[in-house]
Amino acid sequence: MKIKENLYAYPFLDEMILHNVLRSSWPVISKEELELVKLRKYSALSESTQKKLKIFQLLLDEPLKVKKNEVTIPETAYLALTHQCNLKCVYCYAEADMTKNYPDQLSFIEWFQLLEQLKDCGVKKVIFTGGEIGLNHDSLKYIDYAYQLGLSVGLITNGTLIGKKRNAQFLADRCESMTISLDSIDKEENDKNRGRGCYEIAMRGIRNLLDIGFHNIYVNATVTNYNLKSVDQTIEFFKENGIAYKLGGFSELGRGSMADISLSFEERKEIECKEKSAQRSAFLKPFTIKESCGLGLGEFVINPVGDIFACKLLETDDYKLGNIRKNKLADIYNHKEIELLESQNIHHLSGCQTCSFRYLCGGGCRAQHYYHTNDIHGVDRSECQLLQELIKNQMYRIWKQTEMT
C-alpha cells in the first residue's frame, strides 16, 4: 500500500510495517496509527510512535548516500578442481557425475601458478570446490600450498575428502572453514535426494571433524519434497552440534530443472523463513541500501579448464569473463567486459526501478532470474513474490527484536 511517494505500508499479522524506500528503514505500527499517518495527523500519534517516525526517518524524502561499488578483483575465489562427482544428486545445478572429465584441464603446475597469481592480485580467500574435490588426487597439495601462501582456505565437500581421520586433521590444521552437503538427518530421506550411501559419507566426515575438535563446520542442506518432513529434526541436529547451516530449496538449474521434486510456494516460503531466522546475522539491515546481489563483486569462480565466471551458479557464456591461460586476472577486471557486472543491478533490471523492495533485495539472485528468463537483465516475478514475503517476515522480526532491547 502506497502512503505517499517512497513511503509504503505492508500488513503483517495484525500490524503494519511502515517502509521508507529511500532511507531503507521501517518501524512496525498498529493499523489505527497507520490511518493517522495516512491523514498526516502526526501530532495525534502516541509519543512513542512519533519517536519511531523520527528515529527511523520515516518522513524524510532524501535518499541515503550510496557508495558506488567499483568492480575490482574480488577477495574470494572459488576454485573448482573438478566437475566429477561420486554422487548424483537429483537437483545438481552443475549436472556433475563421474563422466564430467573435461579434456585439457589445468595441470598441477598451472594450479600452483594460479594460486600464486591470486595471492599477488590481492585475493584473500580461496574456497576449493567441485564436483567433489576429493576426486582430484592433488587436492590436498593445492590446499596445503594455498595455506603456505598465507591465503585463508575453505572447502566444500560431500564428505569424501574428510572420510579418513588423518585427512580431516590435515585439513583442520589448514582450513578456516569446511562446508559439507547433508540434506537430512534421516538416512532414507537424505539418500533419496543425493543417492544411496551419501548419508554415511557425509556423517562420517562430520563426525571426524567433531571428534578432532574442529567446529567451524557449515552444512548446505537442500530441501525437496523428499526430505521436507525431516527439516525440523535436521535443524535440531545442527543446533545440538554447533553446526552452522544454510537451508533452502534447490535451484531449477541443471538436473534441478528436470526434477519433479519442487516445493510449493508456501513450502518454499516456510523453509526460507526458517533459514533466514537461523542466520547468525540478519540479511536485512536498516539504513542499508542494496543495489545488487553482489554478482562478481565479492567472489568469482575458476573452473577445471581455467574459465573464469562471475558466479559459481552462472557458468555460462553470458557470464564468462575470460580464461586464466589467456588473460591475467588484473587485465580481466580492467577490461570493458566488466561493464556486464556493473549492469547487474536494480537500475538496469526489468521492473526493479518501480518496486518498493528494490533497495532491500538488490534485485535478488541473478542466477535464479537468469535461468527462469534466459535474459541477463530479466526478472522472474514468482521469485520476486517469494523474496518480498521473506523480506516482510524479516522486517517484522528485526523490528520486534529491536523493541525488546
Model-identified regions with their sequence ranges:
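Short Fe-S-cluster ligation motifs
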Residues: 114-134, 343-344, 378-405
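Cysteine-cluster motifs in flexible loop/terminal segments that predominantly coordinate metals
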Residues: 346-393
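C-terminal accessory region of radical SAM enzymes
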Residues: 214, 252, 260-288, 313-362, ...
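Short, small/polar residue-rich loop motifs at catalytic or cofactor-binding pockets
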Residues: 13, 293-297, 318
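N-terminal [4Fe-4S]-dependent radical SAM core
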Residues: 2-28, 45-78
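Radical SAM/AdoMet-radical enzyme domain recognition
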Residues: 108-129, 136-250
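Canonical Radical SAM [4Fe-4S] cluster-binding loop centered on the CxxxCxxC motif
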Residues: 70-72, 76-108
